[in-house]
């Protein structure tokens, strides 16, 4: 017997899961279980299937009804002869109503049900073989099962269903009334009561009422689902209505979007207008200031570049040098000495580079600095000479004096001579190769001969090192050989102060020469 195909497995489980009792989990009652316990033939959810796996395969064997495709015919027969309804009734009959998984499936009732499912599945496998359906199972209908009624499909053709329902509904109501009327008339004729006309009046009214009800029901049926279900009457809307409503909604959305854009653009325009007004006011104020100052040419450009209180300031409050500047006329003006080098330069030479001012000699400077010519100039010349001496140089090997430098030994002139000299030696050093070893040995022998008469020697004496000074002999010059004294420090401070004052005087003089005249 071969294994069932994938299509057979899907067909069988589709039918088994259509049973209402199999649509919920056997243990917890969760909807749409997709796992199954073959041992008991019940359907489980994924959480309960994990609990069954922890019990072991000897108590419960778990398979997926959707993912697993290696089902056997015996396992399918277990699911067909079992089911949630059969298992629930069997456990209830044997008094096993607990919800504890371990206690429930380790009980005597679970053991009996396992044996029963196994026996029934073996019998069904031998009897039916590879047939999809058993005699005990409900044979699937030849026609497809009725589908659930679609809401929109019922709207598409409401007249047919409603008219059929309406035509079938009033027939039972007509039959008893028609039967009662002849009975009443037949009973009235032989008896011949005292007043037959009075009896005919209510019957006509009743017939009229029946006819009115019959006429109203088809009209109510045309209203769609409202008449069919007996609830509020819902009217069918055509496709054109939906299109019109959608167009109206789109038009409303467009209008709202335009209103939002207009509302957003209005404050922006107001801010732009206000900023333009402020800009025009600033320009007017600036023009008035320019007219008052009567500045033109290089002076105006220079003042704007320096930012001397003009309209370029960020805040509303600013200090203006040019606005407070006044022209002072001297009674006996002194003509300034011509400056050839500084006159040729651009007007902003003092602000672009300051090193050129200090590089010039003292004789070329203004007469206002004559007090510095005698003292500072001579001192600077001496200071430059002094400063060059204490600056230590990073002397290399070639800058050392010749007395301390060891002459480089000449390399061997001929390689054959080196081979003859060191041919039998196993290892040689660079000193031996270049002839330095003999000189070192000579110096060592000389030191040993000099110290041979002494009773004790030290490593400093042996290697000709200078003795270290005692603790009491340390002084400032030995610890800091290049430390400056107070006189040099004072002279340095004076020189720096003199340079700063000269620079400040030069700046002020240049400003007065350019903007004061």
UniProtKB/Swiss-Prot annotation:
Keyword Phosphoprotein: yes
Keywords recorded for this protein, A-Z: Coiled coil, Cytoplasm, ER-Golgi transport, Golgi apparatus, GTPase activation, Membrane, Metal-binding, Phosphoprotein, Protein transport, Transport, Zinc, Zinc-finger
Keyword Membrane in record: yes
Annotated InterPro entries: ARFGAP/RecO, ArfGAP_dom, ArfGAP_dom_sf
Entry GO MF terms: GTPase activator activity; zinc ion binding
Positions of the UniProt region annotated as Disordered: 139-200, 291-349, 362-422
Bias (Polar residues): 159-176, 312-333
Basic and acidic residues bias: start-end ranges: 291-305, 379-390
Coiled coil: 243-263
Record protein name field: ADP-ribosylation factor GTPase-activating protein 3
Organism: Bos taurus
């Amino acid at each position: 017997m071969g294994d069932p195909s994938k299509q057979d497995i899907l067909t069988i489980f589709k039918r088994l899961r259509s049973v209402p009792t199999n649509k919920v989990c056997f243990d917890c009652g969760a909807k749409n279980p997709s796992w199954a316990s073959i041992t008991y033939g019940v359907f489980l959810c994924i959480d309960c299937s994990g609990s069954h796996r922890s019990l072991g395969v000897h108590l419960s064997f778990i398979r997926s009804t959707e993912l697993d495709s290696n089902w056997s015919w015996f396992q399918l027969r277990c699911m067909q002869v079992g089911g949630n309804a059969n298992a629930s009734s069997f456990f209830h009959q044997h008094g096993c109503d607990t919800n504890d998984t371990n206690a429930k499936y380790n009980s005597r009732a679970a053991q009996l049900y396992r044996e029963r499912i196994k026996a029934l599945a073996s019998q069904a496998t031998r009897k039916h073989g590879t047939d999809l359906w058993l005699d005990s199972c409900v044979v699937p209908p030849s026609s497809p099962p009725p589908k659930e009624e679609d809401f929109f499909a019922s709207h598409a053709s409401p007249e047919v269903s409603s008219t059929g329902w309406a035509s079938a509904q009033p027939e039972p109501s007509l039959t008893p009334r028609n039967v009662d009327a002849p009975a009443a008339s037949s009973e009235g004729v032989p008896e011949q009561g005292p007043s037959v006309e009075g009896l005919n009046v209510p019957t006509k009214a009743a017939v009229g009422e029946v006819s009115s009800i019959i006429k109203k029901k088809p009209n109510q049926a045309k209203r769609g689902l409202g008449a069919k279900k007996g609830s509020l009457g819902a009217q069918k809307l055509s496709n054109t209505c939906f299109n019109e409503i959608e167009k109206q909604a789109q038009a409303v959305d467009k209008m709202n979007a335009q209103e939002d854009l207009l509302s957003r653009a209005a404050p922006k325009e107001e801010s732009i207008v206000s900023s333009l007004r402020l800009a025009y006011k600033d320009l007017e104020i600036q023009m008035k200031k320019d007219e008052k100052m009567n500045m033109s040419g290089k002076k105006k450009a220079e003042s704007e570049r320096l930012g001397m209180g003009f309209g370029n300031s960020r805040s509303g409050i600013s200090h203006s040098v040019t606005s407070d500047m006044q022209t002072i006329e001297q009674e006996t003006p002194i003509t300034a000495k011509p400056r050839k080098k500084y006159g040729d330069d651009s007007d902003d030479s003092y602000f672009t580079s300051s090193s050129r001012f200090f590089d010039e000699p003292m004789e070329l400077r203004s007469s206002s600095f004559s007090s510095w010519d005698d003292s500072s100039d001579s001192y600077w010349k001496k200071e430059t000479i002094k400063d060059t001496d204490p600056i230590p140089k990073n002397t290399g090997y070639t800058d050392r004096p010749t007395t301390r430098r060891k002459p480089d030994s000449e390399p061997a002139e001929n390689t054959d001579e080196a081979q003859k000299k060191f041919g039998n030696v196993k290892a040689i050093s660079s000193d031996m190769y270049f002839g330095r070893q003999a000189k070192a040995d000579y110096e060592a022998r000389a030191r040993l001969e000099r110290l041979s008469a002494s009773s004790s020697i030290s490593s400093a004496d042996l290697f000709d090192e200078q003795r270290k000074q005692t603790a009491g002999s340390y002084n400032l010059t030995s610890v800091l050989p290049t430390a400056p004294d107070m006189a040099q420090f004072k002279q340095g401070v004076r020189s720096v102060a003199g340079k700063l004052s000269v620079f400040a005087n030069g700046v002020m003089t240049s400003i007065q020469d350019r903007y004061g005249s």
